[in-house]
Amino acid sequence: DVYKRQGLSAIPNSELPPEKAFKAETGGASGSLFSILIGAIDKGIENSSNFGEFLTNASNRISLIGEAKEGDKTMLDALIPAAKASLNNPKNSLEEASLAAREGAKKTVTMPAKKGRAKYVENAGIGHMDPGAFSTSEIISFVCNYIRIENEKAL
């Protein structure tokens, strides 16, 4: 089961906060970094008016821990643009965050990897989308859509 391998199945059935349940199941460097994102998103779901702030806090923590920045061909190439877009357009923050994350992930195709395993492969991964950026954009897109649907139900 793909969800079990990714640690996602641990979240709904755990007494732990989502980020801790995910980290406990996945481990590794990417598990730690994605657990930060999941924690920020959990807070963002509870308070969608500050979604951009939660994404910004997550990107700052991930950048510090991973010693990476936007342009290094990492998950930050989707996360940072999403956070900025959400903050810059509060009225449409969810839609803007989702679009910016997807665009940021697409841009990694032409970037040489400066961090992670991809920096060791031929051409530093140029020509391929960064998997962390892609995963981040998919997570953000899914969550933004979920929040939008829940907000519509509440009306």
Model-derived segments and spans:
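N-terminal loops that bind phosphate or other acidic moieties
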Residues: 1-155
